[in-house]
């Protein structure tokens, strides 16, 4: 009895203990109160996905992130959805399991961030993924198996520094599987733990942005290489990606000339993350290298890096882990810093991996998209240089990197051979790589949802060949293009008459190839002065979230960063600036010949005497200390010095939105400006004030408000806003401006996905703001034109921070004059129009001054004014009446003669039919005056009288009159050499 009681007591105590332990157990669901706010009502067809959180034990749980039952309406649709991390404390993702099939999903990307681009249950990814910094956590495509992280390795989320939200992006390539209109709930399941992981995972992306595959070419190599300049990382998995033409992708670590394989795989196999065969560590000073081998066989035209399956891509994703205290979650490489090194690449990298046909079918790209018109890219990816967008938005671009639209870039398709039409790359336009914005389709995505909301984060998701990552600023707001200049509407370039700028093809300076060209200026002798970055590159690893430079260990640039170039021979006349700068940016020259430069890494402004070796004359700002007070800058961009007063104006900058004025001695005077807000920024608001231009005689300072795509002008004395210049053709960015009396020159940035405006230079009438010319280079192409300077004779120089190139442009013959000569060449004499036309040959020494050019424009305006002179209708009427009278007389004579001498055996016709029948040419159903007059006696087109054919009315004239319809055709231009 006592034993039974004892057993019952033990059982009761056990139950109580179990209950208390259950009460003490803190289920993940118990802290998910906020999660209820965003719980989704899934479609009935998605049953089983309605429980997104499942506890595993006291510290671990799974999180299902799935589409809430969607049905894409068109191929190549990108849908995004977000889910908040259901815990406040730090957690770690230690496993992923894809919940998708290639039958419906082309690829998926999972990002971590703190602010999704939308709060809806799902949205078109054209609106972006995140509005702040985002980290890619996972990528899946082509029925890939789950990615396994090594023990002790996890992606850090939550807490004070980790991401609070997950954003899932799903690319639906072929929608034929949705013909039954079923709902899709594809996604990924995460295994999370609260247990701190000693090793933090990250992703290193290597990608090409400028590969061109000629048609029919058997083997084409695309090489990528970058110096590794971070704490050691340990590679444990990799993934390759190309489209149809890729044969093999190989990745290596190069240390002291020795190549160590990271991974090698056929991109035609399922595109999973494959584990490395042997552990590979990468340390400071190593080089990471990758090669993609393509074939152009079977193609009839060149294939470029792009976002459709008929384009190509060359991507290698390296998954790594680092010690938690040094961890960096994402790094990129889009350059080839050591092209000669690939001469020693292991032979295996050049050998395609055989793939069975059934395996190709398993993972093949969707065929229905192959013949689609190639979408314009972009882009650009910035290649680490300055696109003031969050590094995270860069990942949106990654979405394009994973599939048929996975390019980077850019909106405007990168095509190095487009010399006159495009002038811009992919990423970039991936380039360009970057955030998914409208991919060029117009149906379901157009409208307010796309036009107004779609730009919010996409502004940050361009790669601009990935050098434009230049900063990790907050993304610019959505903005609609406005027109505040008189008479502006949908923009059409007025390439009229007497002002046209073209590249000076004889100038050899385009092949100088210094480092990233950040600034250009002209000294008092009209010598070109270049400010460049040598072997330093501004990329996503350059700054932390507080804009503190992270690569001080590299030391200053060990070569001369300021080059004085002969404007004709492009010879280096003088150089300076060694061991002074880390990341050069703006350059200007005052009336005394002093150089004013900015360094975004140092957060400082320097005044330099060109030939002095005693150091700067003046330094503003604190070295390596970003700030926003009177003594600090935050990545200052440019300087302008007023000639009359010596006042110094500094545009500050990437992380401040202001203009700061100093005295000639460097004393703070005043500042103005604030950060832009909303889609319609107000006067005096800036989003990266990037370039300055003084208009001395009007006491105005004009600012290239880069990310707002406009130019703002202010009074230098009162700081009063004067006006805004903004054109649709600017696109979303205005990078740099330069003023000469009467004219304002500007250069824009690469287009975003879905945008049409190419990257190009502009010439504007300063008084009216109207665009009077646009121009692009012939040799090479603009990728990220970063600065512009013009001389008073109309010579223009543009420096590109991505292609490391400087172009020279000069005034050329006016278009009107060329047409005038063409008319004369055709045998028609036209009186010379001397006052309205200016013929300016590129090599003429005495080029017209800017004041003369301004007069030309005024005269052109008078000539074009429709309100002046005799009305056009009256002139036309006076000209037409004599022609009608002569025609009537001729027809009457013809009719009379045919009655007297016509063939009486033919079938009678009405008089009207007889006349019109005679006036018809071969195969014609209307009046042919050429054949009519050709039948008259004494008329000859070739110097001989035509033999009469009136005796045979039933025979049609075998002469089709083509000779009488000859037009003068100018010979086709010789194709420009590709570079």
UniProtKB/Swiss-Prot annotation:
PROSITE patterns: CU2_MONOOXYGENASE_1, CU2_MONOOXYGENASE_2, NHL. Zn(2+) binds at residues 585, 690, 786. Binds one Zn(2+) ion per subunit. Its cofactor is Zn(2+); Cu(2+). Keywords: Calcium, Cleavage on pair of basic residues, Copper, Cytoplasmic vesicle, Disulfide bond, Glycoprotein, Lipid metabolism, Lyase, Membrane, Metal-binding, Monooxygenase, Multifunctional enzyme, Oxidoreductase, Phosphoprotein, Repeat, Signal, Transmembrane, Transmembrane helix, Vitamin C, Zinc. Residues 894-979 are cytoplasmic. Disulfide bonds join 46-185, 80-125, 113-130, 226-333, 292-314, 634-655, 702-713. Its main location: membrane. It is found in: Cytoplasmic vesicle, Secretory vesicle membrane. Residues 25-34 form a propeptide. Pfam families: Cu2_monoox_C, Cu2_monooxygen, NHL. Cu(2+) 1 binds at residues 106-107, 171. It catalyses: a [peptide]-C-terminal glycine + 2 L-ascorbate + O2 = a [peptide]-C-terminal (2S)-2-hydroxyglycine + 2 monodehydro-L-ascorbate radical + H2O; a [peptide]-C-terminal (2S)-2-hydroxyglycine = a [peptide]-C-terminal amide + glyoxylate; N-dodecanoylglycine + 2 L-ascorbate + O2 = N-dodecanoyl-(2S)-hydroxyglycine + 2 monodehydro-L-ascorbate radical + H2O; N-dodecanoyl-(2S)-hydroxyglycine = dodecanamide + glyoxylate. Residues 1-497 are annotated as: Peptidylglycine alpha-hydroxylating monooxygenase. Its EC number is 1.14.17.3, 4.3.2.5. PAM activity is inhibited by EDTA, phenylglyoxal and diethyl pyrocarbonate. PAL activity is stimulated by cadmium and inhibited by mercury. Glycans are attached at residue 765. Disruption phenotype: Embryonic lethality between 14.5 days post coitum (dpc) and 15.5 dpc with severe edema. Edema are probably due to cardiovascular deficits, characterized by thinning of the aorta and carotid arteries. Loss of amidated peptides. The modification Phosphothreonine is found at residue 949. Cu(2+) 2 binds at residues 241, 243, 313. In the C-terminal section; belongs to the peptidyl-alpha-hydroxyglycine alpha-amidating lyase family. In the N-terminal section; belongs to the copper type II ascorbate-dependent monooxygenase family. Monomer. Interacts with RASSF9. This is Peptidyl-glycine alpha-amidating monooxygenase. It comes from Mus musculus (Mouse).
């Amino acid at each position: 009895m006592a034993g039974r009681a004892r057993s019952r007591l033990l059982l009761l105590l056990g139950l109580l203990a179990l209950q208390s332990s259950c009460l003490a157990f803190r289920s993940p669901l118990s802290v998910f109160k906020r999660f209820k706010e965003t719980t989704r009502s899934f479609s009935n067809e998605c049953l089983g996905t309605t429980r997104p959180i499942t506890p595993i034990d006291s510290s671990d749980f799974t999180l299902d992130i799935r589409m809430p039952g969607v049905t894409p309406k068109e191929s190549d649709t990108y849908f995004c959805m977000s889910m908040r991390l259901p815990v406040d404390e730090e957690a770690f993702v230690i496993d992923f399991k894809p919940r998708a099939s290639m039958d419906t999903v082309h690829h998926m990307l999972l990002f971590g961030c703190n602010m999704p681009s939308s709060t809806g249950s799902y949205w078109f990814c054209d609106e972006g993924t995140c509005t702040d910094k985002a980290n890619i956590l996972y990528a899946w495509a082509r029925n890939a198996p789950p990615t396994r992280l090594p023990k002790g390795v996890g992606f850090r989320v939550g807490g004070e520094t980790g991401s609070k939200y997950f954003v899932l992006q799903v690319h639906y390539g072929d929608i034929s599987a949705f013909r039954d209109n079923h709902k899709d709930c594809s996604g990924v399941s995460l295994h999370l733990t609260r247990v701190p992981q000693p090793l933090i995972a990250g992703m290193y992306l290597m990608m090409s942005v400028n590969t061109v595959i000629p048609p029919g070419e058997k083997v084409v190599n695309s090489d990528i290489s970058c110096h590794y300049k971070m704490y050691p990382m340990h590679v444990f998995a990799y993934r390759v990606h190309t489209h149809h033409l890729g044969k093999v992708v190989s990745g290596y670590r190069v240390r002291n000339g020795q190549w160590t394989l990271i991974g090698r795989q056929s991109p035609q196999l399922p595109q999973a993350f494959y584990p490395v065969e042997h552990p590979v560590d990468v340390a400071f000073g190593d080089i990471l290298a990758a090669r993609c081998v393509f074939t152009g066989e079977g193609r009839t035209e060149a294939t470029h890096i792009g976002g459709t399956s008929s384009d190509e891509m060359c991507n290698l994703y390296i998954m790594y882990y680092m010690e938690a205290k040094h961890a960096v979650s994402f790094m990129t490489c889009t350059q080839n810093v050591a092209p000669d090194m690939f001469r020693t690449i292991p032979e295996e990298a050049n050998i395609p991996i055989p793939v069975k046909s059934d395996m190709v079918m398993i993972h093949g790209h969707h065929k229905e998209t192959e013949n689609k018109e190639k979408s314009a890219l972009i882009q650009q990816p910035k290649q680490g240089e300055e696109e003031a967008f969050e590094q995270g938005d860069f990942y949106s671009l990654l979405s394009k990197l994973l599939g048929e639209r996975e390019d980077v870039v850019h909106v405007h398709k990168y095509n190095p051979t487009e010399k006159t039409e495009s002038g811009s790359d992919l990423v970039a336009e991936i380039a360009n790589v970057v955030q998914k914005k409208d991919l060029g389709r117009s149906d379901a995505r157009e409208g307010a949802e796309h036009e107004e909301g779609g730009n919010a984060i996409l502004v940050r998701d361009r790669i601009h060949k990935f050098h434009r990552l230049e900063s990790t600023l907050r993304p610019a707001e959505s903005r609609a293009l406005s027109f505040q200049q008189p008479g502006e509407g949908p923009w059409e370039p007025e390439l009229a008459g007497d002002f046209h700028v073209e590249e000076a093809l004889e100038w050899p300076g385009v092949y100088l190839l210094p480092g990233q060209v950040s600034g250009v200026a002209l000294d008092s002798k009209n010598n070109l002065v270049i400010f460049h970055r040598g072997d330093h590159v501004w990329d996503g690893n350059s700054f932390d979230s507080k804009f503190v430079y992270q690569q001080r260990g590299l030391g200053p640039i060990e070569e001369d960063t300021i080059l004085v170039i002969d404007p004709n021979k492009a010879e280096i006349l003088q150089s300076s600036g060694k061991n002074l700068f880390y990341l050069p940016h703006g350059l200007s020259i005052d009336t005394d010949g002093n150089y004013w430069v900015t360094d975004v890494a140092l957060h400082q402004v320097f005044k330099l005497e060109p030939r002095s070796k005693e150091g700067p004359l003046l330094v503003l700002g604190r070295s390596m200390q970003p700030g926003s007070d009177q003594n600090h800058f935050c990545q200052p961009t440019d300087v302008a010095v007023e000639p009359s007063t010596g006042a110094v104006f500094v545009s500050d900058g990437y992380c401040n939105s202001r203009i700061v004025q100093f005295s000639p001695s460097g004393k703070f005077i005043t500042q103005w400006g604030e950060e832009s807000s909303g889609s319609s920024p107000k006067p005096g608001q800036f989003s990266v004030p990037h370039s300055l231009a003084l208009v001395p005689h009007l006491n105005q300072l004009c600012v290239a408000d880069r990310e707002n795509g406009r130019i703002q002008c202010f009074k230098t004395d009162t700081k009063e806003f004067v006006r805004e210049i903004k054109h649709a053709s600017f696109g979303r960015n205005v990078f740099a401006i330069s003023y000469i009396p009467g004219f304002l020159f500007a250069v824009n940035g690469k287009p975003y996905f879905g945008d049409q405006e190419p990257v190009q230079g502009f010439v504007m009438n300063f008084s009216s703001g109207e665009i009077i010319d646009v121009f692009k280079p012939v040799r090479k192409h603009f990728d990220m034109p970063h600065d512009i300077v013009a001389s008073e004779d109309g010579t223009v120089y543009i420096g590109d921070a991505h292609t490391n190139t400087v172009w020279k442009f000069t005034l050329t013959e006016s278009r009107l004059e060329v047409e005038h000569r063409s008319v004369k060449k055709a045998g028609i004499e036209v009186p010379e129009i001397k006052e309205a036309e200016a013929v300016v040959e590129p090599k003429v020494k005495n080029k017209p001054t800017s004041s003369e050019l301004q007069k030309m424009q005024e005269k052109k305006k008078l000539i074009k004014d429709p309100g002046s002179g005799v009305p056009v209708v009256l002139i036309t009427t006076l000209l037409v009446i004599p022609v009608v009278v002569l025609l009537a007389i001729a027809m009457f004579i013809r009719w009379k003669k045919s009655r007297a001498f016509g063939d009486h055996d033919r079938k009678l016709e009405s008089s009207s039919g007889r006349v019109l029948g005679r006036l018809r040419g071969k195969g014609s159903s209307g009046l042919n005056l050429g054949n009519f007059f050709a039948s008259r006696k004494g008329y000859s087109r070739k110097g001989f009288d035509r033999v009469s054919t009136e005796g045979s009315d039933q025979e049609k004239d075998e002469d089709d009159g083509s000779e009488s319809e000859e037009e003068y055709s100018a010979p086709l231009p010789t194709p420009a050499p590709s570079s």
